[in-house]
């Protein structure tokens, strides 16, 4: 972490201890902090500043995405994730399945990496195509957090769309 991080955090903690709720409205108000990084965030994702916002945390945002994009219907109930997914990602995925009455044991497909810890795009796409109409969502990382492997998002998305499924990517490590 940058050396200045500790002193910046200490400054905000001191402000909180001395001013409490008034810290939201003083000379450097907390109430508008979410605007400070908009230009950098927009540039990072290729968006306009009015199209981005810093909010929540990674797991909360994943829950929000799953609430919108995991919509099991008919035989289309399965979800594909990577074996060894980040623990909070795994729990978010399985909790959404259970909430919708879907058994993760029967409907969650975990793609395993090879012996070197890398995920084969061919294996992922083959699993997607084999699962076919039963697949509701592919939820994978953009960059796998153990190995740093960048997954082929375009090929995976193409395969998912070919069978009528959504493709979602957690870019927390990207």
Question: Could you tell me what each predicted segment is?
Answer:
Residues 1-174:
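Pyridoxal 5′-phosphate
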């Amino acid at each position: 972490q940058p050396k200045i991080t500790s002193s910046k955090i200490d400054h905000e903690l001191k402000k909180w201890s001395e001013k409490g709720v008034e810290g939201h409205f003083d000379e450097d108000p907390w109430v508008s902090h979410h605007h400070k990084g908009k230009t950098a965030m927009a540039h990072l994702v290729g968006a306009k500043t009015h199209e981005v916002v810093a909010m929540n945390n990674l797991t909360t945002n994943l829950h929000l995405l799953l609430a919108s994009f995991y919509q099991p219907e008919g035989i289309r109930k399965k979800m594909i994730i990577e074996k060894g997914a980040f623990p909070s990602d795994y729990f978010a995925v399985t909790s959404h399945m259970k909430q919708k009455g879907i058994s993760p044991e029967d409907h969650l497909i975990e793609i395993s990496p090879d012996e070197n810890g890398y995920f084969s795009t061919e294996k992922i796409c083959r699993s997607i195509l084999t699962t076919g109409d039963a697949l509701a969502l592919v939820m994978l990382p953009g960059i796998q957090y153990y190995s740093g492997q960048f997954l082929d998002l375009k090929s995976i998305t193409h395969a998912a769309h070919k069978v009528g499924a959504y493709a979602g990517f957690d870019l927390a490590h990207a």
